[in-house]
Swiss-Prot record:
Predominant location: cytoplasm
Function statement: Member of a network of 50S ribosomal subunit biogenesis factors which assembles along the 30S-50S interface, preventing incorrect 23S rRNA structures from forming. Promotes peptidyl transferase center (PTC) maturation.
Keyword line: Cytoplasm, Ribosome biogenesis, RNA-binding, rRNA-binding
Organism annotation: Idiomarina loihiensis (strain ATCC BAA-735 / DSM 15497 / L2-TR)
Phylogenetic lineage: Bacteria, Pseudomonadati, Pseudomonadota, Gammaproteobacteria, Alteromonadales
Keyword Cytoplasm: yes
Family of the protein in this entry: Belongs to the DarP family.
Protein name as catalogued: Dual-action ribosomal maturation protein DarP
Entry's Gene Ontology cellular component terms: cytosol
NCBIfam families to which the protein is assigned, alphabetical: PRK05255.1-1 (NF003593)
UniProt keyword Nuclease present: no
GO molecular function: ribosome binding; rRNA binding
One biological process term in Gene Ontology: assembly of large subunit precursor of preribosome
Region (Disordered): 1-30
Amino acid sequence: MPKRPAENPEQSDDFVSKSQKKREMAERQELGTQLVNLTDSQLAKMPLDDELRDAVLLARKIRNKHEGYRRQLQFIGKLMRLRDIAPIEQALNNLKNAHQQQTSIFHEIETTRDKLLHEGDDALQEFIEEHPHADRQKLRQLIRLAEKQRAEQKPPVAARQLFVYLRELLG
């Protein structure tokens, strides 16, 4: 007859299956892998204690030693089981969101530049109304130069300069 968890309700609340424990360990080990793959500046922003930070740095050093690296990742997972990982997960999510925000801003600037280049004075007037601090003369000059370079099939230097100027204004 197979063993069952205790019928006592007090004990059944604390019961966690072996499979659930393994899933949690794998999640924490994956979180450790994400920490190892961060850049130095990103890792410096993580709320890690010294022991965990040292373990992550060691894993980076032995990355090309397959078995040692695997065991180090397991050790990082073990260290993380003993700690509250919510702040670490939050910091990683903030890093991911910051990248997504930068990407969306980049796309918005590209769209604005393309609109200014293709729709002419109406788009420029609309942009100036939305951003009164923008230099109308500089924008007109860059747009004219970009159109000229496109007509002459030259590299789009002015379009890049327009992008940089828009990034300064919007970013």
